[in-house]
């Protein structure tokens, strides 16, 4: 059943948390902080030198072959080509047990993973919304409100609670069978949307080589009519192959991403076991994009449908390759993954899929040197894509492979833009709408790692860290000639950056001693960015006795309302505490509410009218925003 999977997801979340929550003495220089905000099923990430050379050249191009071909998004000719690709890759992995390939598939929670350009305020201003990564792009979460009710998700049970100026009453709940695990919910226009993973056992010990067979995960979506919130009614559903990754909602259309790892077995004997399905039907070959590199055994699947007709897909695409960091702008979906070539240099593969009114179109794909920290390290603005990466391993001269170009032009771009990049540094790239490099800066912050980033219009900010926290500011007004404007060095580091009104940038991270070895607690920083060339730390505040927070990998857990001058999040002390702060330029940070929680099951803060609601697991508490005195509570 799905119990094992749920425990694995919870354990994975704890593992992430431990990486972030240092206590007392920590060897900072050895810390490698990589925050991934999307839940993903991780497939083959790495290969040893020369491994891909033994693959069928007509099926998967080697690194050398890639230099001689353009890298447009190419669809499969037919199912035979896809099957051959998967079988060749699986044979290669079986032949080389000493390969650097990592895992078959390990699940990561879609706390979704990671990040927010916008404030989480509704259009009316009467209630708050989830902290979003991109303005205008809706995201599902574990808590939602429509201003009249609060919708909560806890242990796969969705509960609808009516609110009335701080008073609360449970109206209804939606429960699932043991094989279904709900991971996200969304509310819009009297519709409640549930996203989750359905696990089915395939085979048993009598007719399968595997003991008790194996579990096949499918992503499922259920849409309910909540015009009568006390009696929600299911009006449609969608199902697709693979475990749930993430989702977005734009202009009434839902876009669902899942990770599918085909498994050939002798039980089901399904002829097209290697082809993903949507609503029980195989995705057509012309809608399946072939591997960009030697990643021929896993898919990222995208399905679109309208909330008005949730059982009928409007489009679907399958892209070979897993999704490490997924970023969705107002017009495009960017699927990225880490990749290690023959040279053992880390790279990021990028695939671009445009979307509009439920239709999906493959645009381009490329690769850049280095790895993304999270979805804030990648941002689309005025048709260009800006990224900051950390360069690992040794240098290779085939850094960028722009799309739709000849090998000669590609190599010229590499020579002009990447030749000075060295390992152990960081880079900034600007790519055009075809994912061709048009601007770059290299060799930033030697021996440091990017911990957070925020792009704000024509200016970008990013934090690197080893022993001190340099906050870099970058002028991006000329995309072809980005320039470093300034560099502020202070102890500690910021894991999360958020715009906080005109000329202000909020940072949340850790305060660390100047020697870089002793943590002092969770640190709040307010940066004055009025002059990007002369950024200053206007005020700072250390939460004593705290040793961590999850804001670096779970941006949805951060409540920020600039107009109300409030922000809150969970910190870890001897227990778990939700803390709410306000800010004044003269007086600095001030704690206005602190509530110790009984455990960590996902906590969110939100407001409706003049009441602040704190949700933790199956508990909701209400507080007056005039003094933050408790008004009511309910256990669901």
Where are these regions (language model features)?
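Extended, solvent-exposed functional surface patches
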Residues: 24-25, 155
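Single-pass transmembrane signal-anchor helices and their membrane-water interface zones
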Residues: 1-6, 26-53
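Generic signature of intrinsically disordered, low-complexity, basic-rich segments
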Residues: 25-26, 39, 409, 503
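Disordered, charged N-terminal biogenesis/targeting segments of membrane/secreted proteins
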Residues: 1-20
